[in-house]
């Protein structure tokens, strides 16, 4: 269950739980509760969701898109209980009627699909790389620096510099 959290006071959400405990589902709900809040459909550009693996990142993006699509086209007489439970949870947290949640989900889905490059669900490594690239000048790094994952290559280069 999502708690109603004042995002101005506490803008960070960290979930720590074991495998198979529903973390991804909970993170998707949390993401949707922020995305569908009154600030607008482009809010996704200012949300950063970080995972450990590429697989988890891809899964979370897929689940967010799938949830938005399911909510936007939701029909209580035809659709599954999972979408109904997501909508119910969002109604509790956001204090909105189903029709408004569906409308916002549709607008947000369109915005994300048209600006997918700003849909920030990534691994810790990718997030850090983006951060370092943003401040490469301040860190006295070349604008086009490269990351090497080959330890031996890096060690050899360091030893040559000594």
What positions do the PLM features span?
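Accessory nucleic-acid engagement/destabilization modules that flank
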Residues: 139-142, 157, 161-162
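P-loop NTPase Walker
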Residues: 1-138
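Gly/Lys-enriched N-terminal cap/neck module of very large, oligomeric protein machines
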Residues: 120, 137, 142-152
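Hydrophobic face of alpha-helices
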Residues: 28, 61, 152, 156-159
């Amino acid at each position: 269950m999502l708690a109603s959290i004042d995002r101005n006071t506490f803008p960070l959400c960290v979930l720590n739980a074991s495998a198979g405990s529903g973390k991804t589902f909970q993170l998707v709900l949390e993401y949707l509760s922020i995305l569908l809040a009154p600030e607008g459909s482009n809010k996704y550009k200012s949300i950063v969701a970080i995972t450990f693996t590429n697989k988890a990142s891809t899964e979370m993006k897929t689940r967010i898109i799938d949830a938005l699509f399911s909510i936007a086209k939701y029909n209580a007489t035809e659709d599954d209980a999972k979408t109904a439970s997501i909508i119910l949870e969002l109604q509790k947290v956001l204090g909105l009627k189903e029709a408004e949640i569906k409308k916002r989900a549709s607008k947000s889905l369109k915005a994300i699909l048209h600006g997918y490059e700003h849909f920030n669900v990534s691994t810790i490594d990718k997030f850090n790389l983006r951060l370092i690239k943003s401040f490469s000048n301040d860190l006295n790094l070349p604008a086009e620096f490269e990351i090497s994952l080959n330890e031996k290559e890096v060690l050899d280069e360091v030893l040559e510099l000594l």
